[in-house]
């Protein structure tokens, strides 16, 4: 089985969940949860749950967090054969605050180690990247590294923009991206079209297709998402779900899209399977639902 190369961040996520409505500048009783995360690592974890072989191209520090990350990846079967070790640097760390519904309200990320993932790192590993079935990347990499990948990969490149700020790295690379998974503000920045409803989401997605992206999956959160390709546009409503927490849904969606693409699914079916994976994820208090599987996703999809 050909592996999927996942390129991006691997960090420790510390989440704070208030029991009631979050009060700014006040003490909030709640629960604090520490977990291994990072968009790249989470996508890789979800892909393993879906039964795919995965190699994670990331940077790890020389601290206890890095050792915990390595042990977790070993147990999950996520390959770290091409990961960069930086002994005197902190492993990437991400702290976020959720509201009473579990939705993230704000976050602070210490991701300086990701700057070590420079073009030279990828040039040394280009053969391994191009030996993959496809490459799924987040935008925690330096802009010049994303450009290097986009211009030198010979396999499809799937990209999760991750944030508005990091989305700016993609503005000149859109014609080189196979599949893009932006949320509303990321799509607005990249397309130049305000997304206020389903019709404007369609226009933004079509604009991204016109700019050269082959497939766009534009997430509108709890409403669902819009999928677009050159000759097709599909609206995929969010499935019924008992929402526990929404953090991690985008990573599950990204993983399911890559998995579905490699299954040979069409745009509409990719959208349905992606929505199914996201729904399964938000029904668990963990960022990654251990109950996610190919069978569960197929069973849940319409």
Task: Label the model's feature ranges.
Residues 1-59, 64-78, 242-244:
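Glycine-rich phosphate/adenosyl-contacting loop at the front of the ribokinase-like
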Residues 1-6, 167, 198-302:
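Conserved phosphate-binding/catalytic region of the ribokinase-like
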Residues 10, 185-186, 252:
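Alpha-helix/helix-capping structural signal
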Residues 15, 107, 190-192, 228, ...:
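Residues that scaffold the ATP/ADP-binding catalytic core of kinase and kinase-like folds
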Residues 24-29, 49-133, 298-302:
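Conserved N-terminal subdomain of the carbohydrate kinase-like
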Residues 47, 183, 250:
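Short, conserved phosphate/pyrophosphate- and ester-handling motifs at nucleotide-, phospho-/glycolipid
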Residues 134-203, 223-225:
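Conserved beta-alpha-beta core of the PfkB/ribokinase-like small-molecule kinase fold
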């Amino acid at each position: 089985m050909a592996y999927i190369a996942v390129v991006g961040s691997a960090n420790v996520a510390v989440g704070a969940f208030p029991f009631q409505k979050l009060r700014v500048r006040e003490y909030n009783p709640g629960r604090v949860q520490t977990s291994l995360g990072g968009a790249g690592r989470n996508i890789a974890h979800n892909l393993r749950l879906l039964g795919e072989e995965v190699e994670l191209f990331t940077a790890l520090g020389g601290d206890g967090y890095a050792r915990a990350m390595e042990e977790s990846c070993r147990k999950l079967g996520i390959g770290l054969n091409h990961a960069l070790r930086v002994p005197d640097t902190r492993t990437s760390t991400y702290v976020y605050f959720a509201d009473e519904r579990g939705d993230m309200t704000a976050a602070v990320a210490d991701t300086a180690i990701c700057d070590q993932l420079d073009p030279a790192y990828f040039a040394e590993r280009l053969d391994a990247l191009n030996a993959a079935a496809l490459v799924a990347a987040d935008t925690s990499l330096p802009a010049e590294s994303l450009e290097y990948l986009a211009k030198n990969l010979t396999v499809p490149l799937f990209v999760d923009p991750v944030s508005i700020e990091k989305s700016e790295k993609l503005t000149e690379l859109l014609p080189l991206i196979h599949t893009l998974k932006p949320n509303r503000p990321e799509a607005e920045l990249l397309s130049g079209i305000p997304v206020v409803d389903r019709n404007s989401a369609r226009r933004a997605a079509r604009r991204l297709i016109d700019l050269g992206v082959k497939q766009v999956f534009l997430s509108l959160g709890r409403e669902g998402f819009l999928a677009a390709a050159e000759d097709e546009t599909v609206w995929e409503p969010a499935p019924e779900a008992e929402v526990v927490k929404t953090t991690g849904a985008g990573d599950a969606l990204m993983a399911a899209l890559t998995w579905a693409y490699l299954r040979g699914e069409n745009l509409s079916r990719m959208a349905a399977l992606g929505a199914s994976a996201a729904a399964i994820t938000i029904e668990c208090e963990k960022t990654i639902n251990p109950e996610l599987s190919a069978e569960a996703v197929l069973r849940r999809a319409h």
